[in-house]
Regions:
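N-terminal signal peptide c-region/cleavage motif recognized by signal peptidases
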Residues: 15-17
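Extracytosolic ligand-binding ectodomains
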Residues: 4-10, 20-377
Length: 377
């Protein structure tokens, strides 16, 4: 089996594309701090469509090691050597942001798998699959308001992800009667956050939000509990994977976070638009990688496949793959994607919204005994 998968990836990397083929460059963080997220994305490549609009689709998959320099290098390779029609990636916000300037320069659409909110000249070329931080933060703040939380401590990544979550909470918090008591940061590779946690506790918050993703998000949480903090601890949707549950263990009981529908696909009401496709993806993924192996991050890549499946046929009516005209047409088509159902919700993109999610893309869960338990309204 390992040999078969390796052969497939080699074929994806080195097969010479036919002129009419559609070439998709995928930069993922399969090593480095975001590896627990990126591995499930790499495992999802085999479930992407191999033909769209009657044209063969080639996927060129590279690891960026959660590193901005490597991500930019991958993007250059995609553009200069592989002549890709679109770039998908990366897994985390920093490498995604490193790809964006190359996407703009080469006029190549980018679909980020992290909630990277491109601005200015980058905005027209960058689309994003995950839910916006603002959409997810609003759900958490609503829960805080209902539970009488007024003072919120914050400890987040010392990077764009941590910045974006702090900004979202600062902007939306006052309307919910929630005020941040401070702003502590840590690096994705840090082995200890004791000093920062002491400072957070010292501000006497009613609750704490950890602005981190994947396994590193467990570190501040377990340290808060070890140092005696008894209040609620909230997390972002970036923490919703099995490795987070495994690393945090019983200390995570009671953690509250927003998630996409696919995480609790079997508990969705039958009329939820994502239930059928989420069930399809989960059964295929876990059938290959084992029961309980589902990750919402792999599902983001699967949803990217649904989005390009809707946009590419429209672009094919205007130009041939492998040309700037096709890339421009594909960008235009992506901006007009409507009611595309994915595992994480329903996508409606426009010239002002490159995320395309609404409230159908979020739910709140509480961690109990290493499992996600839906918080009912």
């Amino acid at each position: 089996m390992k040999k078969t998968v390796a052969s497939l990836l080699c074929g994806l990397l080195f097969s010479a594309p036919v002129l009419a083929d559609i070439n998709v460059g995928i930069s993922l963080s399969t090593t480095g701090p975001a590896a627990s997220l990126g591995i499930s994305e790499r495992n999802t490549v085999e479930f992407l469509p191999t033909e769209i609009g009657g044209e063969k689709v080639n996927y060129i998959v590279l690891d960026d090691a959660t590193d901005t320099t490597a991500a930019a290098r991958n993007a250059r390779k995609f553009v200069n050597e592989n002549n890709v029609d679109i770039i998908i990636g990366s897994t985390a916000v920093p490498p995604s942001s490193a790809i964006a300037p190359i996407a703009v320069e080469s006029k190549t659409p980018q679909i980020a798998l992290a909630p990277f909110a491109a601005e200015g000249a980058e905005f027209p070329w960058v689309f994003t699959v995950p839910q916006t931080n603002e959409l997810m933060a609003a759900a958490l703040l609503e829960h805080m308001q209902k539970n009488g939380i007024k003072k919120l401590g914050y400890i987040g990544f010392a990077d764009v992800w941590g910045d974006n979550w702090h900004e979202a909470l600062s902007e939306l918090g006052p309307d919910a009667g929630v005020t941040l008591t401070g702003d502590e940061r840590f690096s994705r590779n840090d082995a200890s956050v004791g000093g920062q946690v002491l400072k957070v506790i010292g501000t006497k918050p009613d609750a704490v939000l950890v602005g981190a993703t994947g396994t590193p998000a467990a570190l501040p949480h377990t340290e808060l509990r070890r140092m005696g903090f008894k209040g609620p601890i909230y997390h972002t949707h970036g923490a919703a994977n099995q490795s987070f549950l495994r690393i945090g263990g019983d200390a995570l009981n009671g953690a509250i976070l927003p998630i996409g529908p696919v995480v609790i696909w079997d508990k969705l009401p039958d009329d939820h638009p994502s239930k059928a496709i989420a069930s399809e993806y989960v059964k295929a993924y876990e059938g290959k990688h084992g029961e309980g192996s589902l990750s919402p991050f792999g599902a983001y890549l699967f949803d990217a496949g649904q989005i390009i499946s809707a946009a590419i046929p429209v672009a094919l009516e205007k130009a041939k793959p492998g040309t700037e005209a096709f890339r421009v047409a594909l960008r235009d088509a992506l901006e007009n994607v409507q009611e595309v159902v994915g595992t994480h919700g329903v996508f409606n993109l426009s010239d002002t919204d490159h995320f395309g999610h609404d409230e159908r893309a979020r739910m709140l869960v509480e961690v109990q005994d290493k499992a996600w338990v839906l918080i009912e309204d």
